[in-house]
């Protein structure tokens, strides 16, 4: 090993140790526990090796199937909304006008607020008695109200609204970074050729910010798959499991029912899906960069 490589490795070593302790070890431990039958509320039953039994039970569990459908619905709904809204916000923030810096700072406030705090805020907003949602919807008439957090149809939508409000600014920040790498000369040349604003956006802007969009898509898909804190604070998976996503279902199995092995199997499933999607997105991102590389 050359001295420069050795020095680089020494600089990386503390980070590698940190990641190993706080990321790789929990993943390994979850894999290990998923092959055991261990119920914390029934300790006299012991810690029994059951092989793939937790995974076969998970495959036939109707609640797990419902949680999977809820998670998929959450992902396929929030991601397009976040990308669309984030792209629009980035295009506005990329324009030159007075107060642009202040606008960028304000836009990032939802992302900067801790998720637990913003979840509690949205829980108050959607409260059926004193929430702002009912006040605006019914013009302050306290005798009329909706209870969106207690409605199996509306409750998932409240989670989606809270998620998009918080994470669209993050997407906007990534896309804005991509927009600022596009040379102005390309737009000037397109204008000289008679391209309209839409044509410039379609043939100049979109192709050049594709890597930024893919990166935002990767981050947001992984984050949406493991959504937990919004559900924990706002609905606790209810009503009637309408917002019971996989991460929260695994949490309930471990900490409410004491089924450590089964809950670990759920966690492993979420991790593997996230890993596969990450590898697919990274391959697409790599292909996109190779297409842009001059030959």
Sequence positions of predicted segments:
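A structural signal for multi-pass alpha-helical bundles of membrane permease subunits
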Residues: 4-295
């Amino acid at each position: 090993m050359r001295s420069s490589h050795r020095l680089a490795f020494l600089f990386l070593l503390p980070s590698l140790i940190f990641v190993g302790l706080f990321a790789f070890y929990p993943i390994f431990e979850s894999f290990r526990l998923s092959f055991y039958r261990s119920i914390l509320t029934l300790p006299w039953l012991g810690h029994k090796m059951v092989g793939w039994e937790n995974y076969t039970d998970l495959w036939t569990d109707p609640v797990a199937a419902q949680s999977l459908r809820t998670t998929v619905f959450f992902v396929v709904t929030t991601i397009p909304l976040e990308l669309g809204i984030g792209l629009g916000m980035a295009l506005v923030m990329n324009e030159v006008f007075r107060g642009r810096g202040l606008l960028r700072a304000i836009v990032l406030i939802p992302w900067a607020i801790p998720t637990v705090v913003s979840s509690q805020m949205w829980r108050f907003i959607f409260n059926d008695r004193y929430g702002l949602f009912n006040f605006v919807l019914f013009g302050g008439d306290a005798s009329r109200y909706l209870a969106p957090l207690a409605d199996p149809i509306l409750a998932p939508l409240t989670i989606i609204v809270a998620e998009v409000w918080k994470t669209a600014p993050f997407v906007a920040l990534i896309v804005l970074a991509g927009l600022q790498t596009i040379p102005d000369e390309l737009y000037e040349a397109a204008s000289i050729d008679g391209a309209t604003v839409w044509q410039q956006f379609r043939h100049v802007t979109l192709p050049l910010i594709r890597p930024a969009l893919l990166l935002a898509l990767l981050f947001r898909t992984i984050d949406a798959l493991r959504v937990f804190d919004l559900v924990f604070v706002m609905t606790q998976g209810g009503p009637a499991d309408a917002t019971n996503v996989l991460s929260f279902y695994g949490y309930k199995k471990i900490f409410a029912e004491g089924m450590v092995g089964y809950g670990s199997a759920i966690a492993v499933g979420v991790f593997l899906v996230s890993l596969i999607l990450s590898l697919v997105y990274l391959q697409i991102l790599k292909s996109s960069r190779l297409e842009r590389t001059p030959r």
